[in-house]
């Protein structure tokens, strides 16, 4: 005979196997809590959130029960985890059009900025808070150079799943020399670049993301404001050659993702809606820019 008893209550939530990731970073992603009624759906959802963090092997996340007390109607929920290396090092190089192209990039996906001055936490860098820190540089010498830096905090303030993203970007590009374009250009690579033709690009973006519970709790919303500034000097490849051009934009991204595994998806769906807008500058300044010169219209 099978006799149905009272619904079980969760006694403890136990986490095992986290060697680098701090325990509070893991617990804040869970949907099961001590004292709540047992829910298989919440345990599956918790395992899915842990898999999507990217710090653990999704195929080895094993939620299980322990210390089951039938008389008291309680049980412990145990999440056994296996940490995996998710940081990235990018090194690339090539040769083409008479130039060497090289790039280097570093991405740390489990960074801890609060421990940056705590030397005991370096393994080899401060880790465990689930933050993402990225650096990248690319150059081919005199013609083109770029640098970018980005940082993402998935839980701003540590209490709610509101993310903060900040990125910076800079690039420097020169134009092609007129000597390079003549019929002897194959032997004139030393005169390929013209430092008198120059474009500098500066970029900054700040974004805030949050999880939303309507129409269901699979949705996220991300809002970003970005600014780019272009400084041109004798630049023949744009609508004007000298001056500055600025671009301010606001973007909103609404995403629904219910996939069970980011790498080997077996179930779920994902879709994204995005919208990017620029402010109506003519309304703010009460000017009709269609009659202005390009240097004024696009500055």
State each model region's role:
Residues 15, 26, 42, 48, ...:
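Acidic, glycine-rich loop-and-beta core segments that form the ion-binding/anion-interacting portion
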Residues 1, 7-62, 153:
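Structural signature for solvent-exposed beta-strand/loop edge elements and short helix-capping sites
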Residues 39-264, 269-270:
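Gram-negative/organellar outer-membrane beta-barrel architecture
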Residues 5, 18-21, 111, 171-173, ...:
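Short connector loops/turns at beta-strand edges and beta->alpha or beta->beta junctions
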Residues 34-37, 90-94, 294-298:
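Short, contiguous acidic/charged loop-to-helix segments that flank catalytic cores in large enzymes
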Residues 34, 139, 193, 279-283:
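A generic structural motif
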Residues 9, 84-88, 282:
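Short, cysteine-centered beta-strand-loop-beta hairpins and adjacent loop/turn segments enriched
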